Amino acid sequence: MKRLLIIGLLTLSLYSFVPVTICGINTNDTRMMSQPAISAGHIAFIYAEDLWTADLDGSNPKRLTVDEGIESNPCFSHDGRLIAFSAQYDGNTDVYIIPVEGGVPVRLTWHPNSDLVRGFTPDGKSVLFASQRSSFTNRYLQLFTVGIGGGF
């Protein structure tokens, strides 16, 4: 009987090292979530190099991009209807926007230097991004804007 009790306790102690699943979500998987952006009704974040949104309480996660490229730097417009983000689809990082409900991303910049989203202008008509496109030494980022209707 004593031997059976010891084996049972050892078995239970081994299970204490197994990752716990809470509400169907493996808590270890959340380590891949990064770069959160918050609006009045949603959270946008990068998970496994794709852009996702969820409700403020974390429910209803929705994958917005499924491209082979790498998305980064999500940012909500002031009215919460658009998400601007940087993406590397053609070997270069450019600025894109997408409706918060999802859809096809719209490319706003076409430049050989990386364009990294930093936010929206106060009027919401342009996206603010950082780039080395005008820098002689490629050591310093400068800020630029591009209209949400497209640009350079």
Give a label for each model feature:
Residues 1-4:
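Positively charged n-region of N-terminal signal peptides that target proteins for export
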Residues 25-56, 73:
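Beta-strand-rich domains and repeat architectures in extracellular enzymes and scaffolds
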Residues 46-52, 65-71, 84-96, 104-116, ...:
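A flexible loop/linker signature enriched in serine peptidases of the S9 family
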Residues 40-41, 79-81, 123-125:
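Short coil/turn segments that connect the beta-strands within blades of beta-propeller domains
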Residues 21-23:
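Sec/Tat signal peptide C-region and signal peptidase I cleavage site
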Residues 7-19:
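Bacterial N-terminal signal peptides
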